[in-house]
Amino acid sequence: HPHEPLWLDVPVRTSQEAADHLGVAVGQIAKSVIFKRKSDDRAVLVITSGDRRVDEKKVAALTGALGRADADFVKAKTGFSIGGVAPLAHSETPVTLIDRELLRFDVVWAAAGHPNGVFALQPAQLEALTGGAPVVDVVQAT
């Protein structure tokens, strides 16, 4: 399978830990950040580059007002625990946005639903696997 998970011998809960273990740039880690949309309690997933911080105001401008997603909300809406949230295969389909910064790389690495699991894919494949999620500017200026 082209997206078969790579199982690491230790959990990697941050982008930096994942990059260090994989020997790749931290920006190549596609981290999944979950917010709670206030209007309907729907999960909002931002798949962002590991070396960037999500700008919540930019996301809210595209999705509506956001609230904090605690660990229970993340688990209920995605089926995954914080630290292992995959960018796809969620319990409930989230509103999904892809950070355009990921397009800097030919290959990115994402969590495979477990803190020890990651998988590689091209940013275009990530778009396809998320059902054509929009690629947008959702990060803080560097």
Predicted ranges, named:
Residues 1-142:
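Extended, low-hydrophobicity, polar/charged segments
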